[in-house]
Swiss-Prot record:
Antimicrobial peptide required to resist Gram-negative bacterial infections, regulated by Dredd. It is found in: Secreted. It comes from the Eukaryota. GO terms for cellular component: extracellular region. This is Diptericin-A. One of its GO terms (biological process) is defense response to bacterium. Keywords: Amidation, Antibiotic, Antimicrobial, Immunity, Innate immunity, Secreted. Belongs to the attacin/sarcotoxin-2 family. There seems to be a family of diptericin in protophormia. Diptericin A is the predominant member.
Length: 82
């Protein structure tokens, strides 16, 4: 007696953002930090078109001249795969 098997499709992976960060410096001159991300926010049904957003932040922290103003940025991009 063979029972029917239920076959489910493999779930799509979550649309996780890409993160990039970095920094460096020394105690005398201060430290720079930077963080950027990219997130795809829309993809066409056929996967040929997509739109993404890219926010970011950077700042120079304590040094001989104090902290720099934080730099906040955001961008958007369109991609077409052919």
């Amino acid at each position: 007696d063979e029972k029917p098997k239920l076959i489910l499709p493999t779930p799509a992976p979550p649309n996780l953002p890409q993160l990039v960060g970095g920094g460096g410096g020394n105690r005398k001159d201060g430290f720079g930090v930077s963080v950027d991300a990219h997130q795809k926010v829309w993809t066409s049904d056929n996967g040929g078109h997509s739109i993404g957003v890219s926010p970011g932040y950077s700042q120079h922290l304590p040094g001989p001249y104090g902290n720099s103003r934080p730099d906040y940025r955001i961008g958007a991009g369109y991609s077409y795969n052919f």
